[in-house]
């Protein structure tokens, strides 16, 4: 208890001093604040039975009951911060933050798409700092949006598969048409060795072609062989077409592309060997290999006497051809076969012109080949220039 006389401030009074009006005793209710003024510790005292506007600062010596000071110290330790309204407001402001963080965490767990949830939670975090009042409405809007997006994602696999299939078929059609156009464009292409012939002169030989186009299904290389006789008495060679089951793997396609490019560069000097090696990879059916070997061995003996009888003036090209057949070709790929497999099965006619169009990745290489000069060059060219077989 501390006493304070209204007449004499700062003086202590007695509890039962009611007779003397000067020294009245006032009971202290509690201590509100503490300060140090000029090195003296003072406490702001709330007097019992008096309004707060009558609170006064009293030095520590005027407080007789030490328990008031102890209660004040314990209250400050338990609260940890001074009891000021401004500080209380600052403490209450972070209270809504844990709710928004919990909601954001729950929203991130329930969402199927992790990337979308992260983006939406980051956007939601920025907006929650700006507008805390619209937090629940904004969260509901994001939840509805995520449901719509998940519904769209559930429909997306079929739609994506359909578009992918449509795009794939459209691309294959474009590749097929472009390769056909490029092959048709290069039909009249004539290599440099045949410098005397023109495109108008080669038009009768349009039927004797072999085309290698990109197939529609697998995108691999296939060869379509079309031959027609130079004279009316020669029978056409049966058409051979490689089916997708007989095609080579994708590695052979790349090797065929390299071989085709090499055939274009070496067309001047090695026009007879390199195109045949190119045919070996592109035009060999796996099923008829053994049959062609037997037929080639049987008819190889018949070809030697027949060729001089039909072409008596030019025996040298046939001899060169026989030498080339005896010499083993260097295998350009692991699956390259010897000449007896890829030579025509019935090749008793030696003056036939064969035009091969090899199309790989929208690039076409045209190869014209003949075993003799007759049929490859026109008769007037043979009279003027007796060049070897090109």
Swiss-Prot record:
UniProt xrefs under Gene3D superfamilies: 2.40.50.40
Residue ranges with Basic residues bias: 1-11, 131-145, 159-170
Biased composition (Polar residues): 73-82, 263-285, 305-314
Subcellular location: Nucleus; Chromosome
Region of interest (Involved in binding to (N(6)-methyladenosine) DNA), residue spans: 22-390
Statement: the UniProt record of this protein carries the keyword Disulfide bond: no
Region (Disordered): 1-22, 73-318
Single GO term (MF): DNA binding
Top-level taxon of origin: Eukaryota
Acidic residues: bias regions: 96-106
UniProt cross-references to PANTHER family, sorted A to Z: POLYCOMB GROUP PROTEIN PC (PTHR46389:SF3)
Subunit structure comment from the entry: Component of PRC1 complex, which contains many PcG proteins like Pc, ph, Scm, Psc, Sce and also chromatin-remodeling proteins such as histone deacetylases. This complex is distinct from the Esc/E(z) complex, at least composed of esc, E(z), Su(z)12, HDAC1/Rpd3 and Caf1-55. The 2 complexes however cooperate and interact together during the first 3 hours of development to establish PcG silencing. Interacts with stx; the interaction targets Pc for ubiquitin-independent proteasomal degradation. Interacts with Nup93-1.
Name of protein: Polycomb group protein Pc
Organism: Drosophila melanogaster (Fruit fly)
Gene from which the chain derives: Pc
